[in-house]
Design a protein with these regions (language model features):
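Short beta-strand segments
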Residues: 19-21, 101-104, 134-135, 174-177
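Active-site proximal helix-loop segment of RNase H-like, two-metal nucleases, encompassing DDE(D)
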Residues: 69, 138, 146-161, 165-167
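RNase H-like polynucleotidyl transferase catalytic core
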Residues: 44-50, 123-145, 161
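Short, aromatic/basic amphipathic alpha-helical patches
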Residues: 113-124
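Acidic/histidine-rich, metal-coordinating catalytic segments
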Residues: 97-110
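Conserved RecA-like P-loop NTPase ATPase core
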Residues: 22, 61, 105, 144, ...
Length: 199
């Protein structure tokens, strides 16, 4: 536990950013009938029947000291999906960083072995060399800021029917709502600081 707390005490360094990663899965449910909209004195009403549209895995990556977050959606929760998320983090979001200090829980897919399963050895080594991994202790995942962000996201926008993943705007609206309710954590507009990507 002290290891993770020591990492959080480090000052902000763009060359060695402290990034937290966590994931959760959500069932995608669509309405079978259009809900009745909000009216004066009456909340929105939804039919209790729904249609199952599968499950989506949400990777949430955040850099707390910068106020940046991203949600990445995938169809599965495998080593390959985690490796793809980490590759995107390194190559797209932190290409100039010397090393990324990555805090995450001890899920079996959260290891350099996943990189070697997903990519050729040279590429896996390149990605692994860019990471400084710190795992939260067992039963201590509450130390991971990404888990706290996922909890807030769950309470504010994932606790209702998500609809159909083929409607990309819906996810952006829900994340925008979450972003709007957390203005103290993000100083720049949603379009440049937070986003949803689907893979």
């Amino acid at each position: 536990m002290e290891d993770v707390l020591d990492v959080y005490h480090r000052p902000h360094d763009p060359l060695r950013p402290v990034v937290c990663l966590d994931e959760t899965s959500r069932q995608v449910l669509a309405n079978t009938r259009d809900p009745l909209p909000v009216a004066p004195g009456r909340p929105a009403r939804h039919d209790p029947e729904y249609e199952r549209k599968g499950v989506v895995n949400c990777f949430l990556v955040t850099e707390p000291l910068r106020g940046w977050r991203q949600v990445r959606l995938s169809d599965q929760r495998t080593r390959l999906d985690w490796a793809a998320c980490v590759k995107e983090l390194i190559d797209s979001h932190y290409p100039d960083a010397e090393r990324i200090v990555l805090i995450m829980d001890q899920l079996n897919t959260h290891s350099p072995a996943s990189l070697y399963e997903a990519f050729p050895p040279a590429e896996a080594k390149r990605l692994d060399d860019k990471l400084e991994i710190h795992h939260t202790p067992k039963h201590g995942s509450w130390l991971n800021v990404a888990e706290i962000e996922l909890s807030a996201l769950q309470r504010q926008c994932l606790n209702r029917r998500l609809g159909d993943r083929t409607q990309p705007g819906r996810h952006h609206v829900r994340l925008a709502l979450y972003h709007q309710r957390c203005p103290h954590q993000a100083q720049t507009p949603l379009s440049s600081n937070s986003r949803v990507t689907e893979h």
